[in-house]
């Protein structure tokens, strides 16, 4: 099937669906009409899309952790703990690494080995292997909406199972769950596989079942300039809307400068709505998610809480609908349930104290928003041009030409010629533009900001700054300064 940004026909969708459900025996558990009936009985307080709509209308920010273990009962106990003790507003099920690579036989071994060991030997919840019945048991054991969070380039079977299991949100997209996660997955294949996931959600919407879709905003989580991550989020929102998705949460990963982060999140929401309306998608409800710091964390727990609360402050002042919570064990590895709950509690405390407060518009905020919007528009305009009006085709060509270029992405289809670095205030700017199609005016703005840092630090603008910035937060500060600064 040729890639194009056009809603799949029922015939195209159901033909491919026959093959998808054969990928693992639990695919047989999915009966679409029965799933529609089941989902219609899910109470609204456990529907992810509905809860996001209510939160946005109320002007509050919801807190959602990451969490997932191999065994069903242990996973349920973990989620209940984060719900009851942590006070989470929304629940995740972080999916294990084997499922992300469609290696279900190894998942099965991991489940059996976990049972023998009496603890999880997988780094997440193997949703496909637990099947529709297992996913429903999880949903029926908690009081909050559930979302699958993963990193799967081919999420088709996983999407079928989790949605039939009553989970009303799926994270990911054809760019954001490929370029940062995989080395050798062709971009056109991944885009088609995610068109399937979106078409599935579109089918449910046609039956009156509301399901949320969330592009993964932080990408590689390492110094991603806001305009690049925003361009990805807007692209994935447009591709999802074409397949019939009506409830979309666009995401952004904290860069660290409060003003830039607030500007970026507001630009993301505004431009997503602008582009959706410009292309005729007038009935899509857009919300935002802010990811707490995705880079290296300090090992000291008290310092880690400082990072968590700073991020929460930014999310709240930006007006995010949701914040993804980190834990004080981030630098060490997979957190205990207690550490995970403590991250949620710290986040919720900050959200409660800041409820209703927003960063007011200022000259500086206005300038930053104008820059981000202009840069984002340059990227998106070129993508539409490359695809001759077709954004899916334009996405493939944008990666081929380096117009879209994700810093530090492992994919061999990513140019890797663009290089980011912080300016003197900690904003993430473009050090090397590669083939990112900015105007000379925008390029000069980036260069001027970096020259200010070079002057302050008494050194040349160079790749050493990038290295210093990558490790800075783990060492206790935002900007990677030389020792004498």
From Swiss-Prot:
<feature type="binding site">
    <location>
        <position position="177"/>
    </location>
    <ligand>
        <name>L-glutamate</name>
    </ligand>
</feature>
<dbReference type="GO" id="GO:0019553">
    <property type="term" value="P:glutamate catabolic process via L-citramalate"/>
</dbReference>
<protein>
    <recommendedName>
        <fullName>Glutamate mutase epsilon subunit</fullName>
        <ecNumber>5.4.99.1</ecNumber>
    </recommendedName>
</protein>
<feature type="binding site">
    <location>
        <begin position="149"/>
        <end position="150"/>
    </location>
    <ligand>
        <name>L-glutamate</name>
    </ligand>
</feature>
<dbReference type="GO" id="GO:0050097">
    <property type="term" value="F:methylaspartate mutase activity"/>
</dbReference>
<feature type="binding site">
    <location>
        <position position="326"/>
    </location>
    <ligand>
        <name>adenosylcob(III)alamin</name>
    </ligand>
</feature>
<dbReference type="Pfam" id="PF06368">
    <property type="entry name" value="Met_asp_mut_E"/>
</dbReference>
<comment type="similarity">
    <text>Belongs to the methylaspartate mutase GlmE subunit family.</text>
</comment>
<comment type="pathway">
    <text>Amino-acid degradation; L-glutamate degradation via mesaconate pathway; acetate and pyruvate from L-glutamate: step 1/4.</text>
</comment>
<feature type="binding site">
    <location>
        <position position="100"/>
    </location>
    <ligand>
        <name>L-glutamate</name>
    </ligand>
</feature>
<feature type="binding site">
    <location>
        <position position="334"/>
    </location>
    <ligand>
        <name>adenosylcob(III)alamin</name>
    </ligand>
</feature>
<feature type="binding site">
    <location>
        <position position="171"/>
    </location>
    <ligand>
        <name>L-glutamate</name>
    </ligand>
</feature>
<comment type="subunit">
    <text>Heterotetramer composed of 2 epsilon subunits (GlmE) and 2 sigma subunits (GlmS). GlmE exists as a homodimer and GlmS as a monomer.</text>
</comment>
<feature type="binding site">
    <location>
        <position position="180"/>
    </location>
    <ligand>
        <name>adenosylcob(III)alamin</name>
    </ligand>
</feature>
<dbReference type="GO" id="GO:0031419">
    <property type="term" value="F:cobalamin binding"/>
</dbReference>
<keyword id="KW-0170">Cobalt</keyword>
<dbReference type="InterPro" id="IPR006396">
    <property type="entry name" value="Glu_mut_E"/>
</dbReference>
<keyword id="KW-0413">Isomerase</keyword>
<feature type="binding site">
    <location>
        <position position="123"/>
    </location>
    <ligand>
        <name>adenosylcob(III)alamin</name>
    </ligand>
</feature>
<dbReference type="InterPro" id="IPR016176">
    <property type="entry name" value="Cbl-dep_enz_cat"/>
</dbReference>
<feature type="binding site">
    <location>
        <position position="66"/>
    </location>
    <ligand>
        <name>L-glutamate</name>
    </ligand>
</feature>
<comment type="function">
    <text>Catalyzes the carbon skeleton rearrangement of L-glutamate to L-threo-3-methylaspartate ((2S,3S)-3-methylaspartate).</text>
</comment>
<keyword id="KW-0846">Cobalamin</keyword>
<feature type="binding site">
    <location>
        <position position="68"/>
    </location>
    <ligand>
        <name>adenosylcob(III)alamin</name>
    </ligand>
</feature>
<feature type="binding site">
    <location>
        <position position="330"/>
    </location>
    <ligand>
        <name>adenosylcob(III)alamin</name>
    </ligand>
</feature>
<feature type="binding site">
    <location>
        <position position="181"/>
    </location>
    <ligand>
        <name>L-glutamate</name>
    </ligand>
</feature>
<dbReference type="GO" id="GO:0019670">
    <property type="term" value="P:anaerobic glutamate catabolic process"/>
</dbReference>
<feature type="binding site">
    <location>
        <position position="297"/>
    </location>
    <ligand>
        <name>adenosylcob(III)alamin</name>
    </ligand>
</feature>
<dbReference type="InterPro" id="IPR014714">
    <property type="entry name" value="Glu_mut_E_C_dom_sf"/>
</dbReference>
């Amino acid at each position: 099937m040729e890639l194009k940004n056009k809603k799949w026909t029922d015939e195209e969708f159901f033909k491919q669906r026959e093959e998808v459900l054969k990928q693992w025996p639990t695919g047989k558990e999915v009966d679409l009409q029965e799933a529609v009936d089941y989902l219609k009985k899910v109470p609204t307080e456990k529907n992810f899309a509905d809860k996001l709509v209510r939160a946005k209308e109320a002007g509050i920010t919801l807190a959602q952790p990451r969490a997932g273990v191999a065994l069903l009962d242990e996973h349920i106990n973990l989620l209940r703990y984060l719900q009851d003790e942590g006070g989470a507003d929304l629940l995740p099920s972080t999916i294990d690494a084997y499922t992300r690579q469609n290696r279900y036989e190894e998942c099965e071994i991991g489940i059996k080995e976990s049972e023998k060991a009496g603890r999880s030997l997988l780094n997440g919840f193997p949703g496909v292997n637990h099947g529709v019945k297992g996913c429903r048991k999880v949903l029926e054991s908690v009081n909050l909406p559930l979302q699958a969070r993963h990193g799967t380039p081919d999420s088709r079977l996983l999407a079928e199972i989790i949605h039939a299991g009553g989970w009303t949100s799926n994270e990911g997209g054809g760019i954001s769950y490929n370029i940062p996660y995989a080395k050798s997955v062709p971009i056109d294949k991944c885009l088609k596989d995610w068109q399937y996931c979106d078409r599935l959600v579109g089918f449910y919407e046609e039956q009156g079942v509301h399901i949320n879709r969330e592009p993964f905003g932080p990408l590689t989580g390492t110094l991603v300039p806001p305009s690049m991550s925003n361009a990805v989020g807007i692209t994935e929102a447009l591709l999802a809307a074409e397949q019939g998705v009506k409830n979309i949460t666009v995401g952004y990963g904290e860069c660290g400068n409060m003003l830039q982060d607030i500007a970026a999140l507001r630009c993301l929401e505004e431009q997503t709505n602008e582009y959706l309306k410009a292309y005729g998608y007038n009935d899509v409800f857009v919300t935002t998610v802010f990811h707490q710091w995705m880079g290296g964390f300090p090992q000291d727990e008290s310092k880690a809480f400082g990072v968590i609360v700073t991020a929460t402050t930014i999310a709240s002042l930006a007006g995010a609908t949701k914040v993804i919570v980190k834990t004080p064990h981030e630098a060490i590895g997979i957190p205990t349930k207690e550490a995970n709950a403590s991250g949620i509690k710290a986040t919720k405390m900050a959200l409660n104290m800041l409820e209703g407060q927003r960063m007011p518009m200022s000259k500086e905020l206005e300038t930053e928003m104008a820059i981000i919007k202009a840069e984002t528009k340059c990227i998106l305009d070129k993508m539409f041009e490359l695809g001759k009006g077709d954004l899916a085709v334009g996405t493939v060509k944008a990666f081929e030409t380096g117009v879209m270029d994700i810093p530090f992405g492992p994919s061999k289809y990513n140019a890797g010629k663009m290089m980011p670095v912080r300016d003197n205030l900690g904003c993430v700017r473009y050090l090397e533009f590669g083939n990112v199609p900015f105007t000379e005016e925008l390029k000069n703005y980036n260069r001027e900001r970096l020259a200010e840092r070079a002057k302050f630090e008494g050194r040349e603008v160079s790749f050493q700054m990038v290295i210093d910035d990558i490790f800075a937060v783990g060492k206790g500060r935002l900007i990677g300064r030389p020792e004498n600064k």
